[in-house]
Curated annotation (Swiss-Prot):
Pfam families: Rib_5-P_isom_A (PF06026). SUPFAM superfamilies: D-ribose-5-phosphate isomerase (RpiA), lid domain, NagB/RpiA/CoA transferase-like. Its EC number is 5.3.1.6. It comes from the Bacteria. GO terms for cellular component: cytosol. The lineage of its organism: Bacteria, Pseudomonadati, Pseudomonadota, Gammaproteobacteria, Pseudomonadales. The active site is at 107 (proton acceptor). Pathway: Carbohydrate degradation; pentose phosphate pathway; D-ribose 5-phosphate from D-ribulose 5-phosphate (non-oxidative stage): step 1/1. Catalyzes the reversible conversion of ribose-5-phosphate to ribulose 5-phosphate. NCBIfam families: PRK00702.1, rpiA. This is Ribose-5-phosphate isomerase A. Belongs to the ribose 5-phosphate isomerase family. Homodimer.
Length: 223
């Protein structure tokens, strides 16, 4: 199977998992990226089975609306049963690195609200230790140099992601060469740096369920 086929398989598995639990009042949280796009496309075939969605980015909102799925602002939603999103890396404890698509802050907010966070990924994303994928950090633009210096003190090699602005109007610094053995601690340390909006570690609030696309089929991992 190609990587695209694996993504489509896990996206369909996520739809199959949540569909029996949805009703006409249900609102689904939806992530950002190529795997999340596969989920949106699969979910759209069942749009009559639920009320609408909360999007983690402008790009996701546009794709949902393109399928005729109503998109709600998170502040107007009192109950979010599911959040479905991809990941750049996951460890066996379902701690994640996310933010390759620069939507990490809104993704983290929607994940925090949802009762169940379902991560969908192809098998290459499961790693023994996080950090081979550069860790994205969303930063207030004027704090870029200060934050970079602090990230060096934490052992990282920060690289400014040129030409990228988040939906919130901020910049991204990608932190290379980190072996993240304590993701909960590092997430808190980076978030404590003045000028950081948030970072791409999803460890304080990890995924509840990981659907992993492999050549042997979709595997399910739980915490």
């Amino acid at each position: 199977m190609t990587q695209d086929q694996l993504k489509q398989a896990v996206a369909q598995a996520a739809v199959d998992f949540i569909l029996p639990k949805l009703d006409d009042k249900s609102i689904v949280g939806v992530g950002t990226g190529s795997t999340a796009n596969c989920f949106i496309d699969a979910l759209a075939k069942h749009k009559a089975a639920f009320d609408g969605a909360v999007a983690s980015s402008e790009a996701t909102a546009a794709r949902l609306k393109g399928h005729g799925i109503p998109v709600y602002e998170l502040n107007t939603v009192s109950d979010l049963e599911f959040y479905v999103d991809g990941a750049d890396e996951s460890d066996e404890h379902l701690n994640l690195i996310k933010g390759g698509g620069a939507a990490l802050t809104r993704e983290k907010i929607v994940a925090a609200v949802a009762k169940t966070f379902i991560c969908i990924a192809d098998g290459s994303k499961l790693v023994p230790v996080l950090g081979a994928f550069p860790l994205p950090v969303e930063v207030i633009p004027m704090a870029r140099s200060h934050v970079a210096r602090q990230l060096v003190k934490l052992g990282g090699d920060p690289v400014y992601r040129e030409g990228v602005l988040t939906d919130n109007g901020n910049i991204i610094i990608d932190v290379h060469n980190m072996s993240i053995t304590n993701p909960v601690e590092l997430e808190a340390q980076i978030n404590a740096i003045v000028g950081v909006v948030t970072n791409g570690l999803f460890a304080a609030r990890p995924a509840d369920l990981l659907l992993l696309g492999t050549t042997e089929g979709v595997k399910t991992l739980t915490r």
